[in-house]
Amino acid sequence: MNQIRHGWTVATVLSAIVLVGLCSQSIQAQTADPPKQPTDSQKSDTPQDPADVQQLKDRVKQLEQTVDELKKLIGTVETTQQKQQQQQQQQQQQVLASDTSGGLRTVNAVFRTGPPNPSSPRGSVTSSTINTDDEKGERSMDIYGFMMLDTGYSFKTNHPDWFDTVRPTKLPGFEGEFAPNGKWYMGVRQSRFGVKTSTPTKWGELKTIFEFELFGTGVDAGQTTFRLRHAYGELGNFGAGQYWTNFGDTDAFPNTFEYWGPNGLIWFRNVQIKWMPFRGRNELTLALERPGASGDQGVYAGRIELAGIRPHLQLPDFTGNVRFNRDWGHIQASWLLGSIKWKDTDDSDKVDFSGSDVRAGLSLTSVLNFNKDNIGRFQATYGQGIQNYFNDAPLDVGAKANPDFILTPTPHRTEGETPTGSIIPPIVGRAIPVFGMSAFLDHTWSKKFTTAVGYSMLNMENTNRQAPGAFRRGQYFVANLLWYPVENFVMGGEYQWGRRNNFQDTFSSDDSRIQFSFKYSFNKGFKW
């Protein structure tokens, strides 16, 4: 609309200038030299009265004033447009800086360079691949990331591969494990780099995100190495790739420094195909996600009979959520349904340990804007076999005594006869029930200082043939003070605590640490 007004204004000015020029030429032609004696046919058409000449001069002067006014109007319009463009660029930088991956929300997992925004939306992603059928509109690409140093002192100990995190499952499971106590640590593994793009098309907006960090896991656990976080795209209401699980709520993550985060929070990046039929005030999202599970063979872990058991995951996990966004915050309900199967591939005995179980879970989350300075972030989740979706994932499947277990009677056997073993396995696998919760408060003291404080817990309902030292309960607590002295920089101190309780041997362990972190962020947006 501003461009239309601008074009109309320019056209008006040009027309007025042409008209002024014509009138000026007419006056000059009439007043410069004495007119020749007109013929009788010209007398009626040629203005001889000086009043007519003065009237034309007055009209020219009025037109010149009009031109001056229109020039001022053009200057005002251009100034307004420049201010609007500057505001849009600032808003884009603020969204990118907070990375409310709402588009892609990446807390600490959240990429925050300023105090938390109580009204920050969640969203999908925010390509540069252009085809001739694209709708007219603005294309954009954002390059962003941060360099981050974590340093601190751990008063106890944990698994050395996870030296810069607080994970209750990685605390000692027996006396002397990971000894000795007390260590200073430093690392830059949280550092991150990402690219987002947005392209309008006739099918809706095409969005992509490609993001890496330096936090090694899996075979690279403990290393500072590149690790893929997101490789995901959306077109209209459909998305595909690796992105935050649809079973979780990224807005429930607090504004903390500790990398791994609350252990009882659903926090998982998974490969998926997603459909988002409703967005905005009320949202619905459905997805098919890559299945996966981990198993604990408990007191039978050393048995040869169990050596050939392999996961047999034939169906994807089905996840969904509904979300209600309001001025005071939001409420979200998420669900998961899937199947866990395992196959005994060892044919050397007569016992088949193959089995299956259902995995299912329900999660309720909420972000409440108590006021502009206080934001509450809450989650409660219950289910079975869903442990790998939790932030600090213990095992999904545990060994349980089989009540139908019997031995084949062998009262008489001739010499050299092959012994007959059990025909029904002594144990069966069962999906382990689990409950997790997280409750945090983000408080803004001023434009320069914020605090996050809260507690999280995960509790397993262990099966009766798990090992006595199996993980049962984990607890997590964090409190911090963060300082934002200038744009794109934050530093601060944080107290972190974690505790582990075992299943049956009464052993427990904990760790307390003080951490100081320095985050230097960058972002650059391009539009065309």
Tell what function each PLM region has.
Residues 27-162, 528:
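N-terminal periplasmic/intermembrane-space "pro-region" immediately following the signal or transit peptide
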Residues 11-22:
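Bacterial N-terminal signal peptides
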Residues 326-471, 528:
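Detector for outer-membrane/organellar transmembrane beta-barrel domains
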Residues 2-13:
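Bacterial N-terminal signal peptides that target proteins for export
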Residues 154-158, 219-221, 249-253, 293-298, ...:
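Outer-membrane beta-barrel proteins
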Residues 128-297, 312-330, 367-382, 386-388:
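Outer membrane beta-barrel
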Residues 509-528:
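Outer-membrane beta-barrel "beta-signal"
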